[in-house]
Amino acid sequence: MQTFPRRIVNGLNAEGKSTIIIDDCRPVDLPGGQFVWRCKTSPADNSSNEDAGAGPFENSCIHDRDGSSFAVFHFKPEDGLMGPGMHTTDTIDYIVVLKGRLEFHSETGVVELKPGDLVVDRGVSHGWRAVGDEPAMTAVVMLPAHPVGSGATI
C-alpha cells in the first residue's frame, strides 16, 4: 500500500504552545489517492487536535459541501482517463503536479503537465491521464464553489 508523501500537522499542546501533533504518512484511502486533511466548515474549526485526515469518511465524496479538502492523487499510465473520466465538480481546485507527467483534458483540448505545473480547475468538464512510463502524483486543495455550466457530475 502506497503511503507517500509525509504529512506534518501542527497544533497546540496542553500548555497552549505550538507543537507538531502529526508526523506520518497516510495510507491510500481513496480510489487513487489519500486525504491529507478535511474541514467540514469554512472557516475551518482549528480548536481540536483531532486528525481530520484519518477517516473513515461518511461518504465517498472527495469534498465537503461547506468545507475544504486537501488530498493527494496518484495516476498510473495504464489506468487511462482517470476516475469518472470527463467530469464536473462544484468545487474550485488548486492543483500542484508533484511527480510524473499528466494530460489535463478539457472538452476542446489537452494540455500536458510536468512536475511543478499548477492548475486552477474551476469545476468545468475535465479529466486526467498519466503519460509516459512512470506514475504521476498531484496535491489538490478543493474548496466549495458555485457551479459553472451544468454543475457537478461527481
Range-by-range predicted roles:
Residues 1-50:
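N-terminal leader/capping segments at the start of a protein or of a new domain
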Residues 8, 13, 18-21, 131-154:
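Double-stranded beta-helix
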Residues 25-27, 51-56, 68-89, 122-125, ...:
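Conserved short histidine dyad/triad with adjacent acidic residue
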Residues 60-64:
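Surface-exposed, low-complexity/disordered Ser/Thr/Gly/Pro/Asn-rich loops and linkers
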Residues 90-107:
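Glycine- and acidic-residue-biased ligand/ion/polar-headgroup-sensing regions
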Residues 107-124:
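Short acidic-glycine-tyrosine-enriched beta hairpin
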Residues 113, 128-131:
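Short, Lys/Arg- and Gly-enriched loop/turn segments at beta-strand edges
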